[in-house]
Regions:
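Tryptophan-paired
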Residues: 50-76
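Asp-box/BNR beta-propeller blade signature and adjacent active/binding-site loops
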Residues: 128-523
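Short, ordered, surface-exposed loop/turn motifs in non-cytosolic proteins
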Residues: 34-60
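Conserved "repeat-terminator" motif of extracellular CCP/Sushi domains
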Residues: 22-30, 84, 104-129
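Bacterial N-terminal signal peptides
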Residues: 7-16
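Short coil/turn motif common to extracellular beta-sandwich-like domains
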Residues: 21-25, 73-79
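Positively charged n-region of N-terminal signal peptides that target proteins for export
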Residues: 1-4
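Surface-exposed interfaces of beta-sheet-rich extracellular modules
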Residues: 75-106
Length: 523
């Protein structure tokens, strides 16, 4: 395998304007077996050097190929440790000269003397052979969050993330950055996730647009069909809990009709809620549940695509309710599914998908699991139908209230019987709202011949593949052209290890066999 000697980069901690009188100049390098510039993963890991209880951390990337010099105190006990793992690489250990030091050495006097004379300290890595790709690295004081993903009719995968100059949700600046700007950035793949484009900003926030929907764009949800791509996003500078009829949080439509080459943006706030003639007139705050919109490419045999979205609405009484809305014109206009019926009350960020029999599934975030409800059409020609009663379920999710995704896919049983599988992703975590870790997919069989109740959907889930063993949170998924599942989610590490700010945004290509751990196969 090719070995490339690379340099440690990105010193995260401020080390002071002047070096200590006991500091000496040393050289750091990193060696990575199997890495080439064609590899989309560009962060290898992080290490920490500790001397006299003073820790200095560096992040390892291929951005600088020349040797770096660093001033550090070697007068006391010096220990070195591997402290930051990224997808795509395994840490091997440290070395000085021809001496391997292991993975967590304390330097001897001889080794410190070698370093003082210019012998490099080398951190060694190797590629792990996986196809996992980190699309956005959170190693900058501007944070990435909130995954959204869709596949167009040409097979192009489009992955979108918040790029948070504010380090926070829309309408907040608790970290005192002086900014409320959030951009939406995208990367695309035309070969089922093997390679990816460079990042593209599809909606750029502007701090000069105070009070306008143009100040920030975030919490995107996506749909695609043909060469059309629709993104619905929260917008502006009013945080969701603070919205009022006079000053609601904003909503934006961002769309492309040329497979993502160009994008248009328009405000949708008062089309969806607030106004007397809007979709939900008593709403004072709203946004679409992030991740994936559901698409029926040929609704009721009309030849037209119908897009379904799940929205969270805070009404004038400050109650949070979930609704499903639909659009037959790429999000330009929306209608509410089920009229005045409220599918889910007192819940949070919702997701939607279409069951094999045409029923519409609403899956909402709540503390302690998920809340499910089912809409059944009685007459598609008139868009008539009825919602079941909402049912809470916890077999398929973590104990904390965190966003997850729902998706229906094709599969084979072991006896080659064709089936449909319903997938639900969620962190397992723990009881705390912020104990977000161990993102996992649950699954269950669903049939084209069965009309389901909410209780049917809430029960009978099987835990599938656990995708992360560390801090991990929101997730989205869609079907790729090759039949695999494109899974896009938030995972450690993040800048400053503060997960209230951001995460790395990781893409995984998952087969049915992987998701179900061999119990079903792909068809």
């Amino acid at each position: 395998m090719r070995r490339i000697t690379l340099l440690l980069l990105s010193i995260f901690l401020a080390w002071g304007a002047m070096a200590s009188v006991t500091d000496v100049k040393i050289i750091y390098k990193v060696e990575v077996d199997g890495w080439t510039s064609a590899n989309p993963n560009t962060h290898f890991g992080g290490i920490t050097l500790t001397c006299n209880d003073v820790a200095k951390s560096v992040n390892l990337t291929p951005r600088n190929l020349d040797a770096n010099e660093m001033n550090i105190d070697l007068s006391g006990n010096v220990s070195i440790s591997f402290t930051r793992k990224y997808r795509g690489f395994d840490f091997v250990g440290f070395s000085i000269g021809k001496t391997d030091l292991g993975q967590a050495p304390t330097l001897t006097a001889k080794q410190k003397k070698q370093m003082k004379k210019g012998t490099p300290l080398v951190a060694k890595f190797k590629t792990d052979g996986s196809k996992d790709v980190t699309l956005f690295y959170d190693d900058d004081p501007k944070a990435y969050r909130i995954p959204a993903i869709a596949t167009t009719g040409t097979g192009r995968i489009v992955a979108v993330s918040d790029y948070r100059h504010s380090l926070d949700d829309i309408g907040r600046d608790v970290h005192r950055t002086g900014s409320m700007r959030i951009d939406l950035v995208a990367r695309t793949s035309d070969d089922n996730g093997a390679t990816w484009s460079q990042p593209q900003t599809i909606a750029q926030g502007d701090d000069n647009q105070v009070g306008s929907y143009l100040r920030a764009f975030g919490d995107a949800t996506m749909a695609a069909y043909g060469t059309n791509i629709l993104v619905m996003a929260a917008a502006g500078d009013v945080i969701y809990p603070g919205g009022t009829a006079e000053n609601p949080n904003r909503m934006a439509r961002i769309y492309s009709t040329d497979n993502g080459q160009t994008w248009q943006i328009e405000e949708m706030t008062r089309k969806v809620y607030v106004e007397a003639n809007s979709l939900i007139p008593d709403g004072v705050s709203s946004f679409f549940g992030s991740g994936k919109l559901a698409v029926d490419p040929d609704f009721n045999g009309t030849g037209k695509a119908r897009v379904y979205g799940a929205v969270l609405i805070k009404n004038a009484e400050r109650t949070d309710n979930n609704y499903v809305v639909y659009s037959d014109d790429l999000g330009a206009n929306w209608n509410i599914l089920g009229g005045s019926q409220t599918p889910v009350a007192f819940a949070s960020e919702p997701k939607v998908d279409i069951l094999p029999n045409g029923q519409i599934l609403l899956s909402a975030r709540r503390q302690g699991g998920r809340t499910f409800n089912i809409f059944t059409y009685t007459d598609k020609a008139t868009n008539s139908g009825i919602w079941d009663s909402a049912v809470n379920g916890c077999e398929n999710g973590g104990k904390n209230g965190t966003d997850g995704e729902v998706l229906c896919i094709d599969a084979w049983k072991a006896d080659r019987t064709p089936v449909k599988l319903l997938l639900q992703s969620q962190p397992k975590g723990g009881a705390s709202h912020y104990d977000r870790r161990d993102v996992t997919i649950w699954y269950k069989e669903v049939s084209t011949d069965t009309n389901y109740t909410s209780t049917d959907i809430a029960n009978g889930w099987t835990q599938g593949k656990q995708l992360s063993t560390q801090e991990s949170s929101y997730s989205a998924m869609c079907l790729q052209q090759d039949g695999n599942v494109a899974f896009f989610f938030e995972e450690a590490p993040c800048y400053g290890d503060d997960y209230t700010k951001g995460y790395c945004m990781v893409y995984l290509c998952l087969s049915v066999e992987e998701i179900t751990e061999g119990k079903y196969s792909q068809r």
